[in-house]
Curated annotation (Swiss-Prot):
The lineage of its organism: Bacteria, Pseudomonadati, Pseudomonadota, Gammaproteobacteria, Enterobacterales. This is Pimeloyl-[acyl-carrier protein] methyl ester esterase. GO terms for biological process: biotin biosynthetic process. It comes from Pectobacterium atrosepticum (strain SCRI 1043 / ATCC BAA-672). Substrate binds at residues 22, 82-83, 143-147, 235. Its main location: cytoplasm. The gene is bioH.
Length: 255
């Protein structure tokens, strides 16, 4: 029987749901829990098919968002990292009344590079899909290493991410491929342009997966949202710069 892993902790009055990225699970937020728990009621979720949320197969973005929403508090601040940012954004589009505020971290409404849009080359994502079936473990490790590349403690941060993956049940190759498919195909640029939910977009200046140019483009296209680019961070700013990250989240969520 498929069941979503959902853990709640914290002393605050505001509900804050944290959604992790591709290949990982809610353990990735451990350094954030101690910092955020005094201020929020935290909801730590393993996305369907990831970590402790076993029994789910690959699914489209909309289905993933709906499954997560069924267990969510009536109204919350939603924070999504990378793939989790797409899921949180889809939830804000599907059920705006249930989203008090939205925070996306190192995420993009369209991860794939298009003619005039900065992103990951589609053949790179296809390459990862191909390699997954050949060498599952190594491909996940390579993807994790990419996320911390260029930061001061890149190796240490990559080890931490790898530990998070190994600590919980691994997603199946099918689920991982499904996640890459979402990253390759999703394009929420147009729908999110009309979003009325307050939106904060956090980026790392050194991010090799979501180019910092995305921040500037969306500043122009989504003038109602706010962006912050963290100068020495890459794709996992909450791991490389936990205190600065926490400050941004608290300031925005409690404003």
């Amino acid at each position: 029987m498929a069941a979503l892993y959902w853990q709640t902790e914290g002393a605050g009055n505001t509900d804050l749901v944290l959604l992790h990225g591709w290949g990982l699970n809610a353990q990735v937020w451990q350094s954030m829990v101690v910092r955020l728990a005094p201020h929020f009621r935290l909801h730590l979720v393993d996305l369907p098919g990831y970590g402790r949320s076993q029994g789910f197969g690959p699914m489209p973005l909309n289905d993933m968002a709906n499954i997560v929403l069924t267990q969510a508090p009536e109204r919350a601040v939603w924070l999504g990292w990378s793939l989790g940012g797409l899921v949180a954004s889809q939830i804000a589009l599907s059920a705006p009344l249930r989203v008090e505020k939205l925070i996306t971290v190192a995420s993009s409404p369209c991860f794939s590079a298009q003619d005039d849009w900065p992103g990951i080359k589609p053949d790179v994502l296809q390459g990862f899909q191909q390699q997954l079936s050949e060498d599952f473990q190594r491909t996940v490790e390579r993807f994790l290493a990419l996320q911390t590349l260029g930061t001061e403690n890149a190796r240490q941060d990559a080890r931490l991410l790898k530990g998070v993956v190994l600590e919980q049940p691994m997603p199946s190759v099918d689920v991982l491929n499904g996640g890459l498919e979402i990253l390759r195909e999703a394009d929420l640029r147009q729908p999110l342009a009309d979003l009325t939910v307050p939106l904060l977009r956090l980026y790392g200046a050194l991010d090799g997966l979501v180019p910092r140019k995305v921040a500037g483009r969306l500043d122009d296209e989504w003038p109602n949202s706010t962006s912050v680019v963290m100068p020495k961070a890459a794709h996992a700013p909450f791991i490389s710069h936990p205190d600065a990250f926490t400050e941004q989240v608290i300031a925005f969520a409690q404003a």
